[in-house]
């Protein structure tokens, strides 16, 4: 397979030179949709290879939400070193830049100890920042973004594409005229900053991980089996205390636009507490939202990080652990 019998054929995973036999990778990156078994695999690998499991999931950063985000349990964390789990308060709007800074510290700690860094999670933007660097695009003012979206709905995507061609001809030429989201994004950036989006991307910060030597995979279970696991897991979360966890979060009266307040299942359960939904309805919505998110994860990684090798959980287990 693409094994990590502690000699890593990295060329099998990301196209880089495998190096000498017996070479250990600089890091292992395990991405995949929610409920695909990533965390369990990372834990077994950490136990077998003296590794450190480093969180790469934006929602598992929040300490208020262990159960509803399927964060590793305290018992699992005791079995191997885990970093960046539950390290951020729910009141914080934690950015990708803040994640990269925290991940750099965890990576340096693992390297200093001679341990294998194992990045695991489902947040594509975090993996992209680790392997390609963080975009230098400054925040776009809400009024600019809202105006562009309003015109997109009112005038249509072709009108926006024509306007983009006037401001950023090269950028417009790279985009399909019907690509609504990318055209709107490119137009809002050039209107807000006066510079094409490509200029900003060219100023991206250097990646935290070198382009050679790491193993990168995307766990891709069979879809229907995955969706069944998502439904079963959401029901198990409710039995394990997710209701009480979300109730405690709701009692803090935080801004509903904060990332932690939008974790899958949280909005629906808060509506249940307000009497707007029955528990059964809230559970169905939470599970459905999670299934839809898993679908988006498949699509995002396929288009945004094609260098990640897609494997079944069984192939990943065999390749990493030789089982």
Curated annotation (Swiss-Prot):
The record marks 123, 145 as: Interaction with substrate tRNA. Signal peptide: none annotated. Substrate binds at residues 34-39. GO terms for biological process: tRNA modification. It is an enzyme of class 2 (transferase). It catalyses: adenosine(37) in tRNA + dimethylallyl diphosphate = N(6)-dimethylallyladenosine(37) in tRNA + diphosphate. ATP binds at residues 32-39. GO terms for molecular function: ATP binding; tRNA dimethylallyltransferase activity. Its cofactor is Mg(2+). It comes from the Bacteria. Pfam families: IPPT (PF01715). Its EC number is 2.5.1.75. Keywords: ATP-binding, Magnesium, Nucleotide-binding, Transferase, tRNA processing. Residues 57-60 are annotated as: Interaction with substrate tRNA. Belongs to the IPP transferase family. Monomer. Catalyzes the transfer of a dimethylallyl group onto the adenine at position 37 in tRNAs that read codons beginning with uridine, leading to the formation of N6-(dimethylallyl)adenosine (i(6)A). This is tRNA dimethylallyltransferase. It comes from Rhodopseudomonas palustris (strain BisB5).
